[in-house]
Amino acid sequence: IPSREKYTDLKEKFIFPGIVDMRVFVGEPGYEYKENFRTLSNAALAGGVTSVVTMPNTSPVIDNVSMVDFLKRRGRDKSKINIFPTASLTKGLEGTNMNEFGLLNKKGIIGYTDGTQTIQNTRLMSRIMRSAFDLDALVIQHAEDNELSKDGQVNDGIIATKLGLQGIPDYAEKIIIERDLTLLEDFNCRYHIAQISSEKSVEIIKNRKEIVKFTTGVSINNLSLNQNDIGDFRTFLKLSPPLRTEEDRLSLIKGINQNLIDVIVSDHKPEDEESKRLTFSQAATGASGIETLLPLALELFHNGSIKLSKIIECMTCN
């Protein structure tokens, strides 16, 4: 009787845990023409991603109990992967009125963020942190000063000058991080910087890690690419935060290796073709990335930039 057991030769192979991607934008509800739960889960599984943390930047915004119920139901019915939703820090992502963390916590929300928006008002941010501490809620901040990054398209510097585009300075990121970590000394809530992009930010984190408790993420785009890859107006590399210098990229890799950066994400934000086939300044910001997260990370391993064990840690132990 032939055996029904099947054997697979795994010599010189790795068994990689399912990846947890902590920064994913799904188009449902409101932008299904860009992405829905079915297409998201297919792309995720193709890239080895089994769990995603979704951002609240939908239409309507995920900022109330009914929208959370809808999102979880759609994820359960249409997705083949684990969906962990976040809700917005402020009502309607407007950066004005703080959301109701207590009610949303009961619905299983794992964290609060305004996604691509930054809490600009310092007084509001202090209230958010105080409430988050009281309710053990996780605050996730996209660090970028709006006034300094207004109308910005690419990293501020030689590429911006060459292409004739408005630049986004690295200190636009630095200022928000410094402000929030200063507030964190008093309020001590659970706090996560969604993604950093510059050497200056790495230095701040290095100096503050022993003072306050927080975590930090980085996009695989900023680990693998630099501003030169934009070339002649490649709109699919119009990202937020922008790709910066090679020195910044190497500093981010160093931050991973020195345990200063905790999480590697895809920053998966698919846009439809019509939104990208425009001039660079008019094109939408964002790119699909969930399928390429693992291949790009493994390239960093193969070229000796980051150990495989560290990549696994940053992409599965979130």
Question: Where do the language-model regions lie?
Answer:
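Histidine/acidic residue-rich metal-binding segments in metalloenzymes
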Residues: 99-264
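Metal-associated gating/positioning segment near the N- to mid-region
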Residues: 11-75
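Short, acidic/polar
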Residues: 33-43, 93-104, 179
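Active-site mouth loops of central-metabolism enzymes
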Residues: 22-35, 56-58, 84-97, 116, ...
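N-terminal metal-binding scaffold of metallo-dependent hydrolase/deaminase domains
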Residues: 1-2
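His/Asp/Glu-enriched, well-ordered alpha-helical/loop segment
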Residues: 162-188, 257-258, 263, 269-318
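Alpha-helix-loop-beta-strand connector modules within alpha/beta enzyme cores
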Residues: 16, 65-86, 130-141, 290-296
